[in-house]
Amino acid sequence: MQRLKKGDKVRVISGSEKGKEGIILQVFPELNTAQVEGVNVRKRHKKANQENQEGGIVDIAVPLNMSKLALIDNKAKGKTTRIKYGFDKNNKKVRISKISNSEIGSK
C-alpha cells in the first residue's frame, strides 16, 4: 500500500522547493516519485504540430522524490504527519495519521 496517494495534500520538506504545498496529481510507485500541483515547475519548449498550431514555452510540473514530501493533516491544524496503518470496522486496511490518530480519507 502506497503511503502517499493521488489527491493527498502534501508539503515539500527539503530541496529548493522547501515549504511549498500542493495536491498530488500523479504517483509513480516504480520510480518512487510524485507529481505535485504547482511545485517543481519547469519550462519546456514545445514544437508546433497539427494539434497545437503554435509552439512555445510551456510550464510542466516535474515529479519529486517521495522522500521530499510530507502529508498535511487538516485535523492537526495543517501540520505535517507521518502515516501508520490500521484496520477499520470492516477489516479493511486504512491509513491513519500519527498526530491526530484519525483515519486519512481514501481518495
Curated annotation (Swiss-Prot):
Record keywords, A-Z: Ribonucleoprotein, Ribosomal protein, RNA-binding, rRNA-binding
Entry annotated with the keyword Ribonucleoprotein: yes
An annotated GO cellular component: ribosome
GO BP terms in the entry: translation
GO molecular function: rRNA binding; structural constituent of ribosome
Pfam families noted in UniProt: KOW, ribosomal_L24
Recorded family membership: Belongs to the universal ribosomal protein uL24 family.
Assembly and binders: Part of the 50S ribosomal subunit.
Function description: One of two assembly initiator proteins, it binds directly to the 5'-end of the 23S rRNA, where it nucleates assembly of the 50S subunit.
Descriptive protein name: Large ribosomal subunit protein uL24
Phylogenetic placement of the source organism: Bacteria, Bacillati, Mycoplasmatota, Mycoplasmoidales, Mycoplasmoidaceae
